[in-house]
Structure formats: C-alpha cells, structure tokens
Amino acid sequence: MGFFSNFFKKENSKDDAKNRLKLVLIQDRAMLPSGVLENMKDDILKVLSKYVEIEKSKLNIEMCPYEDDPRKIALVANIPILKSSTREVTKTTKQQKRK
C-alpha cells in the first residue's frame, strides 16, 4: 500500500504554498499590480460569454513561465465550453456584413 500511496497522494499545504509563491513571483516578473489578473479573467469571460456558454466552475486562467524561454511570461487559459450561443454569433455576423 505504501508504494502506491506515493502515486496517488494529494497536494498538501506545502505544495499549495509553493504554487502560490510561484504565482506571486510570476505576477511580479510580469509587473502586474495585484488584482489585474482577476480583472483580465473577468474581461475575457465577458467577451467569450457573448459567443459561447462557459463552465465557469472549471475555468482556469493563469500566468506561467513561457515554455521556450522561462524568463518570459505566458497567459494560459483552459476554458471549458458547454455550447455555442448561436443567437449572438448570428447577430454579430449580420452586423459585420452590414459594414
């Protein structure tokens, strides 16, 4: 049992603290004032919600080191889409055709 418990162990408070510290360091490196990432998430959600229905409980938007150059920052989003909002898409398409 001890052998398998290493594979299935849950994150503990040490891992949580480490992840929070990484996030703080990444945000500091990106020179973003506190709260800006949350505001960005809200704005992204508002725009996407015009076109698709999003499962907000499983939404994950975070900043992390860019894979090719860890000195750079990437904004990574995992946004589960439940269904498209065809009414808004149709309305937007009609508006674009008029221009």
Curated annotation (Swiss-Prot):
A GO CC term attached to the entry: plasma membrane
Function of the protein: Prevents the cell division inhibition by proteins MinC and MinD at internal division sites while permitting inhibition at polar sites. This ensures cell division at the proper site by restricting the formation of a division septum at the midpoint of the long axis of the cell.
Species of origin: Fusobacterium nucleatum subsp. nucleatum (strain ATCC 25586 / DSM 15643 / BCRC 10681 / CIP 101130 / JCM 8532 / KCTC 2640 / LMG 13131 / VPI 4355)
Keywords: Cell cycle, Cell division
Keyword NADP set for record: no
Keyword Cell division: yes
Superkingdom per UniProt: Bacteria
Family: Belongs to the MinE family.
Coiled coil ranges: none
Gene that specifies this protein: minE
Protein name, UniProt field: Cell division topological specificity factor
Single GO BP term: regulation of division septum assembly
